């Protein structure tokens, strides 16, 4: 299990999300906790904090244009931006158009390949990837994942269905994919709360 620490309580991630604490590192910073499937590298973390905070701020503009409340960016190992896209499920009427999937498609088109592994790319997302996007990331060849708001909080704030993702941190580690999560979480939660407060569409199928 992964213990999440903030200034008021300890919370335990559901077993559905993380079933094994082994191999998970945690660093408490600014009263929230960053978790990773490797020993936390402060240089990587500092870079990710800067990128994700900028994405959280930029996301507000995308929402005003009709996009969903998630933004993803893909960078190469030299820090060059390869692709950046927002969620476009509603405005493009396609359930697959999550921010991560859009960014991956754009990167593959730009680089002319379905296999991104040789480019050593990292994806930065304002929130934890859903079940579909985890599959897309894994099969694209992306090497590292950095995200903001964890799925448990996304669901609680918005009502979005993030799918089932048992022990995905360790599954990604087995495949050589680095994961850092809960980066600039507070800023990301504020954007999601504003999205809900302004009565934007919570897109999911009727059950």
Kindly give the residue locations of the regions a language model identified.
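A short, polar/charged loop-to-alpha-helix boundary motif
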Residues: 90-102
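Short, glycine-anchored, charge-dense loop/turn motifs used at functional sites
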Residues: 77-82
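Zinc-dependent deaminase
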Residues: 9, 23-63, 129, 136-207
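Short beta->alpha transition motifs characteristic of CBS
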Residues: 83-89
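Short beta-strand scaffold segments in enzyme catalytic cores
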Residues: 70-75
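Immediate flanking context of iron-sulfur cluster ligation sites
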Residues: 117-127
């Amino acid at each position: 299990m992964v213990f999440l620490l903030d200034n008021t309580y300890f919370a335990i991630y559901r077993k559905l999300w993380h079933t094994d604490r082994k191999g998970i590192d945690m660093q408490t910073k600014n009263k929230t906790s960053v978790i990773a499937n490797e020993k936390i590298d402060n240089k990587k973390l500092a870079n990710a904090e800067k990128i994700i905070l900028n994405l959280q701020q930029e996301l507000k503009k995308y929402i005003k244009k009709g996009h969903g409340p998630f933004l993803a960016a893909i960078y190469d190992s030299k820090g060059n931006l390869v692709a950046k896209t927002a969620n476009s499920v509603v405005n493009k009427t396609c359930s697959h158009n999550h921010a991560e999937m859009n960014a991956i498609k754009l990167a593959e088109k730009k680089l002319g390949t379905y296999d991104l592994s040789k480019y050593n790319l990292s994806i930065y997302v304002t929130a934890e990837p859903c079940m579909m996007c985890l599959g897309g990331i894994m099969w694209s060849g992306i090497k590292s994942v950095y995200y903001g708001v964890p799925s448990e909080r996304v669901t609680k704030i918005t009502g979005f269905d993030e799918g089932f993702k048992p022990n995905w941190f360790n599954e990604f580690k087995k495949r050589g994919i680095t994961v850092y999560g809960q980066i600039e979480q507070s800023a990301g939660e504020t954007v999601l709360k504003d999205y809900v407060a302004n009565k934007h569409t919570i897109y999911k199928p009727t059950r």
